[in-house]
Structures are given as C-alpha cells and as structure tokens.
Amino acid sequence: MLNQAFLNLIKNSIESINSATENGLLDKNKSYGQVQVDIKTQNNEVCVTILDNGVGLPKNVNRLFEPYVTIKKEGTGLGLPIVKRIIEDHLGSLFLLPGQKMKGCDHSGAEAKIILPTINSKQL
C-alpha cells in the first residue's frame, strides 16, 4: 500500500510539471521539469520528501485532503485523501508544503513530506 501512496505522489508531481509547461511557467527551451526524492532517517523515523517544480499548491492546500477536491483538469479528487489515509494507517504523517525554487526555475513548485516510524527487527 505504501508503494501506491508514493507512486501517486510522484504521479501528481509529474502532472503538475506538465501543467506548469502548458501554463508557460516552465519554458521548454530554458528549463525542464524536475522531481526530486529525498529519503532521510533520524531517530526512529524515516522522512521522504518529494519536491517538484510544477504549478505549486493553492492557498487552501488542506482542502486537497478532502474527498472530491482537485485542482487538476482530470481526476476524481480521491488520490490525496487515499494517500493520506494509507500513510496514517502506517502511523505516519503527510504534509503538503510550498516547494523551494529549483535550478533553472523562476517559481516554486510543491513539496510532499511523508514521515513514517521505523520498525526494528524486535518489533516484527
């Protein structure tokens, strides 16, 4: 199930980059779409960050976790609520944040941050 959650978040990043290109935020001749995945472990947690240079997030970003709410032309608005539920079922947290400016890009995209507890062999 976690695989599905991560794939959905990466797919959202790619779709956001495509929208940024269509809307003129990314100039095909000067910049390119980027999805960056970073994984860090600290204490008893693993933090996965997915950063993109797509269109970014709306001001009411938390509404995206509500069923049937979407900012895309296509889709049902169920992806992020399901992703959040999967992560929470694994005792984790999901945050959507404004992204950082990436190399060759004049705007900020979005950042999805997933924090999950680690499991050691004694817990299995």
Can you describe what each PLM-predicted range is?
Residues 14-43, 99-106:
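ATP-lid-like helix-loop hinge signature
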Residues 2-3:
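A residue-level detector for a conserved hydrophobic packing site
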Residues 57-68:
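Short conserved segment of the HATPase_c
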Residues 52:
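Acidic ATP/Mg2+-coordinating residue in the GHKL
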Residues 92-93, 99:
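Conserved glycine-rich
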Residues 87-88:
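Detector for a conserved hydrophobic position within an alpha-helical segment of the HATPase_c
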Residues 79, 83:
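Short alpha-helical Gxxx[C/S/T] motif in the catalytic ATP-binding
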Residues 7-8, 12-15:
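Conserved polar catalytic motif of the HATPase_c/GHKL fold
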